[in-house]
């Protein structure tokens, strides 16, 4: 029997859910609904035969990958143009990590949200 077939949702604790939802809507374009969440539908019209993917992974308790956040999680969001988004976030006054990682898995950048959550932004490699 197959059990988990994908990630159905990511849930975050927030000190002020409305304000944090507004931040994600303004700066990252997340369409936050009245019920307090958003739904993402994955379909690639340009390459319908190619399959996109979402990664779920466990890190050791002492990882520094989430730093400077002290939270026990990090959310990764797919983006179309990492460098353009990072530039826009900087212009909007967001706390953007200067480091950008570019490897066979794509391009990665990071921003901190107002509650200290490190947000990973990922531009998949071509065909990913």
Predicted regions and their residues:
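Vicinal oxygen chelate
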Residues: 1-15, 35, 62-128
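Core segments of cupin and vicinal oxygen chelate
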Residues: 2-5, 11-55, 91
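Residues in well-ordered beta-strands of folded domains
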Residues: 41, 57-59, 122
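A solvent-exposed interaction/effector surface
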Residues: 45, 57-66
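Short intrinsically disordered coil segments
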Residues: 56, 73, 92-94
């Amino acid at each position: 029997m197959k059990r988990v077939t994908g990630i159905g949702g990511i849930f975050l604790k927030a000190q002020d859910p409305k304000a944090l939802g507004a931040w994600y809507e303004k700066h990252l374009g997340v369409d936050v609904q009245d019920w307090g969440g958003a739904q993402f539908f994955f379909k690639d019209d340009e390459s319908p035969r190619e399959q996109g993917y979402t990664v779920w992974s466990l890190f050791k308790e002492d990882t520094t990958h989430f730093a400077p956040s002290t939270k026990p999680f990090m959310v990764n969001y797919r983006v179309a143009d990492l460098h353009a988004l990072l530039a826009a976030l900087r212009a909007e006054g967001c706390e953007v990590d200067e480091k950008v990682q570019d490897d066979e898995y794509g391009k990665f950048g990071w921003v901190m949200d107002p509650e200290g959550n490190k947000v990973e932004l990922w531009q998949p490699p071509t065909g990913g």
